[in-house]
Amino acid sequence: MARLIDQFQRLPGIGPRTAQRLALHLLNQPEDQVQQFADALLAARSQVGQCQSCFHLSADPLCEICSKPERNNGLICVVADSRDLLALERTREFKGQYHVLGGLISPMDGIGPELLHIKPLIERIAKDGISEVILALTPSVEGDTTSLYLARLMKPFCPVSRIAYGLPMGSELEYADEVTLSRALEGRRPMD
């Protein structure tokens, strides 16, 4: 059981107590249900790869988003990973295409630009006549580093913008840190 708990703890966001709860739950299930779970996990791992265009997860050569003709092919939103892409898709606001970098530049972790899907992004922008690139990367040192690096590479090809950062809905100003408040002020927009 300890081995199973250890494996669950390796998943993002799963601590020791949740890992133990998941392990106990699985061990209390009928064997056929556990087998179905294991089969689904192995099938997903072997059948799901990356979209050839945007590097989002996909079981087909092109993901569901890239294969939709109604999407705006002249607009690309750059994200670090598929979780960020899915978060943006939940808003139903963005109607363009995406590009998943596969991480952020982080020299401290040994992740340089060559380890990310940056070269295919630049090739895609140069080849496809992109009208704008939106950078939707996390507001962190790594996100800022990656954004500055990408903006410098892409500016000769098309306009580059970055999503606004600021305060989450329902938050109190007094509890926000200085960087968040500064970004919120910088990203202000006129009232409609």
From Swiss-Prot:
GO MF, one annotated term: DNA binding
Signal peptide per UniProt: none
ZnF C4-type: positions: 51-66
Taxonomic lineage of the native organism: Bacteria, Bacillati, Cyanobacteriota, Cyanophyceae, Synechococcales
Function statement: May play a role in DNA repair. It seems to be involved in an RecBC-independent recombinational process of DNA repair. It may act with RecF and RecO.
Source organism of the structure: Synechococcus sp. (strain CC9902)
Keywords noted in UniProt: DNA damage, DNA recombination, DNA repair, Metal-binding, Zinc, Zinc-finger
Pfam families: RecR_C (PF21175), RecR_HhH (PF21176), RecR_ZnF (PF02132), Toprim_4 (PF13662)
HAMAP family for the chain: RecR
Name this polypeptide is given: Recombination protein RecR
